[in-house]
Amino acid sequence: MVSQNYLGVMSGTSLDGVDLALVDFSQTPKLIAADFTPMPDTLRVALSQLVKKGETSLQALGELDHQLALLYADSIQRFLAKHQLNADDIVAVGCHGQTVWHSPKGQYPFTMQIGDMNLLAARTGITTVGDFRRRDMAFGGQGAPLVPAFHQAVFSSPERLTVVLNIGGISNISVLNPNQQTIGYDVGAGNTLLDIWIEKHLGKRYDANGEWARTGKIHSALLALLLDEPFFQLPPPKSTGRELFNLEWLEHKLTQIKPLPAEDVQATLVEFTVQSIVQALRQIENPQAYPCVLLVCGGGAKNPLIMERLQTHLTDWQVSTTTEYGLDVDYVEAAAFAWLAYQRIHNLPANLPSVTGATQAVSLGAIFPNI
């Protein structure tokens, strides 16, 4: 039997590392194996500085493009060895690359992901599909979010209103409403500000289980300032990233109130993440009064404090994780890029115009052959 295995490779806005998900598409998409490779500190810092400043030299940009491809290739080779697989066992790799800038508005809209796919295909010996977002933008879309199309394929049900919530660096939702077009969009800062703040004050990469945030108190004045951001008033479809929600943005907000203990800021940031999600969910129309199910994935799904606060606010929703529905919370996005590669190899449309704003559904990505 010919293999229908596709490997999704994803490094997100949190810059913590590379997620890999091997998915079998011979029948219903099935996650076969998954893994994670931490991002080296030097590379993470360089990428973080690039995203934060929005400027660099062509030399530095080119070198980061090369380094990322090497990281992806090494991650794939380790994955193959660990799971006793050969390159021939995989039809194609779907690699997102690393977003360093996303600017869907303006006279010349563009998005930029780096990580040389030519080098990745050559190093792994596996046909690679990359550069997914720009084709959607070429047809008038925002190039994001792309994952809702995968959510629709895997999680939709005619008997319920399902919202898939990914809390990664940025929080985004896919609204799978029976008898309506699927919509999906970014709703605010996910883990980005939480991670930035704890790294600044405690030198840690993230707040494990929300333990530090639990020691602080929610500050209502700061929360109101954070929520008073024009992005939240924009109608969907909309997208955002670290170019908005970053340390400079947060520190500017903090200058407008009296000094607070760092742990109180962290507690308030958790509530900010949760409230931005809750506000978005409250705006979803449900005229048929379908049962409402929230499926959470991404790093935030493993933060008990975030999950508790969501359940506190959403008493009329069933709050679950995608793991309970068959897809590990850590690897939903990586699995989505395996699906995007499958769609491209088969010349099938992979964007949802109702989500991205594109004028039509098209296949996404460029194919980089292994030879």
From Swiss-Prot:
Pathway: Amino-sugar metabolism; 1,6-anhydro-N-acetylmuramate degradation; Cell wall biogenesis; peptidoglycan recycling
Domain of life: Bacteria
Annotated binding of ATP, by residue: G12, T13, S14, L15, D16, G17, V18, D19
Keywords: ATP-binding, Carbohydrate metabolism, Kinase, Nucleotide-binding, Transferase
GO molecular function: ATP binding; kinase activity; phosphotransferase activity, alcohol group as acceptor
Annotated GO biological process: 1,6-anhydro-N-acetyl-beta-muramic acid catabolic process; amino sugar metabolic process; peptidoglycan turnover
Record's keyword annotation contains ATP-binding: yes
Catalytic reaction list: 1,6-anhydro-N-acetyl-beta-muramate + ATP + H2O = N-acetyl-D-muramate 6-phosphate + ADP + H(+)
Coiled coil ranges: none
Broadest EC class assigned to this enzyme: transferase
Enzyme nomenclature, EC number: 2.7.1.170
Signal peptide extent: none
Purpose: Catalyzes the specific phosphorylation of 1,6-anhydro-N-acetylmuramic acid (anhMurNAc) with the simultaneous cleavage of the 1,6-anhydro ring, generating MurNAc-6-P. Is required for the utilization of anhMurNAc either imported from the medium or derived from its own cell wall murein, and thus plays a role in cell wall recycling.
HAMAP family, per the entry: AnhMurNAc_kinase
Family named by the database record: Belongs to the anhydro-N-acetylmuramic acid kinase family.
Name this polypeptide is given: Anhydro-N-acetylmuramic acid kinase
Protein species of origin: Glaesserella parasuis serovar 5 (strain SH0165) (Haemophilus parasuis)
